[in-house]
Amino acid sequence: MSNSFIFTSESVSEGHPDKIADQVSDAVLDAILAQDPKARVAVETLVKTGMVVLAGEVTTSAWVDTEELVRKVVHEIGYDNPEIGFDWQSCAVLTAIGKQSPDIAMGVDEFDDHEQGAGDQGLMFGYATNETDVLMPAPITYAHRLVQRQAEVRKHKVLPWLRPDAKSQVTFRYEEGKPVAVDAVVLSTQHAPDVAQKDIREAVMEEIIYHVLPREWLHKDTKYFINPTGSFVIGGPVGDCGLTGRKIIVDTYGGMARHGGGAFSGKDPSKVDRSAAYMGRYVAKNIVAAGLAERCEIQVSYAIGVAEPTSISIETFGTGRIAEETLVKLVREHFDLRPKGLITMLDLLRPIYRPTAAYGHFGRTEGTFTWERTDKADLLREAAGLPIA
């Protein structure tokens, strides 16, 4: 990628069908972990008109009223009106949940003579960049903030005619590798049927777009697409089927970094798809926060049942202050990338996952997002032989 380029990322609201599914899956995970931190959980959710289906594998001593929990999540998201076509009181809740395969458990569980292994093979990436205050790419950061603002003005009745389903997309222009302008903004939001499109466009511009995007990035040629197809009354699970794990680029870096392919929601931290991706973010963010690179991407890989990663590699895109081989050595010295080690380091055996299931797993400032800490930055600078700021 050259130093001058255009880049676009998208996000979706908590009321988008796929995000409803992610939040239900993680709500179930949290409810189980609250009672049984060592549980093995892999829960998938499907949502469609009048229906929520849970399926997967769970091994636990906990008991959860999944029907009540599903209805609570759907209600909190904002599907509380039968006129929308999907609501918390009338939707059916179906479950098809079994136990984790003993063949998998044999390799993952910790015994006296067996260290906890990875829950599956796979490759995971972590990424950070110094272009925003949260060390995330600007396009995905502001795409998230747009749909977060949509939910805020909907729930606080600033724009009471908004409905839960929404999508955003932001196109940034980069020069010398840094974001300098917004070239296009797309905001599609579900709404009540009796609102004029002109009123929707004006309100979205004032209460959402101008509220979120820094004015210095907006210019006379910035293009705005607000509900570009016109009416957006039919939305949510009525308009589209929703499934857990279908928004993995929204969940991570908006396409700016590579992705190993594994989804996060509904998975307990023994699944390295989730926990190692969180650790990858933690490592990359601390490298950037330490000033060892302006951009950093780390890849780790695992074999099922094996504790040690099968590989660790780092790319700094020409922005590193020390060699990438040295960075890998520092990572091996200061971060425990074995499944048990990263679970312990990030304190992942807690009911902290539902908030991750909307508006991105990374770049968040809530205290439960332990992988967003930069507490290793000074240690890395010192180990690299650089003065501590």
From Swiss-Prot:
Organism: Methylococcus capsulatus (strain ATCC 33009 / NCIMB 11132 / Bath)
Annotated residues for binding of Mg(2+): D18
EC class of the enzyme, as a word: transferase
Protein's job: Catalyzes the formation of S-adenosylmethionine (AdoMet) from methionine and ATP. The overall synthetic reaction is composed of two sequential steps, AdoMet formation and the subsequent tripolyphosphate hydrolysis which occurs prior to release of AdoMet from the enzyme.
Matching HAMAP family: S_AdoMet_synth1
Cofactor binding comment, as recorded: Binds 2 divalent ions per subunit.
Name of the protein in question: S-adenosylmethionine synthase
SUBUNIT field: Homotetramer; dimer of dimers.
InterPro entries: ADOMET_SYNTHASE_CS, S-AdoMet_synt_C, S-AdoMet_synt_central, S-AdoMet_synt_N, S-AdoMet_synthetase, S-AdoMet_synthetase_sfam
Cofactor entry: Mg(2+); K(+)
Subcellular location: Cytoplasm
Pathway(s) of this molecule: Amino-acid biosynthesis; S-adenosyl-L-methionine biosynthesis; S-adenosyl-L-methionine from L-methionine: step 1/1
Main location, first listed in the record: cytoplasm
Domain of life (superkingdom): Bacteria
Pfam families registered for this protein in UniProt: S-AdoMet_synt_C, S-AdoMet_synt_M, S-AdoMet_synt_N
A molecular function (GO) term: methionine adenosyltransferase activity
Keywords of this entry: ATP-binding, Cytoplasm, Magnesium, Metal-binding, Nucleotide-binding, One-carbon metabolism, Potassium, Transferase
This enzyme's EC code(s): 2.5.1.6
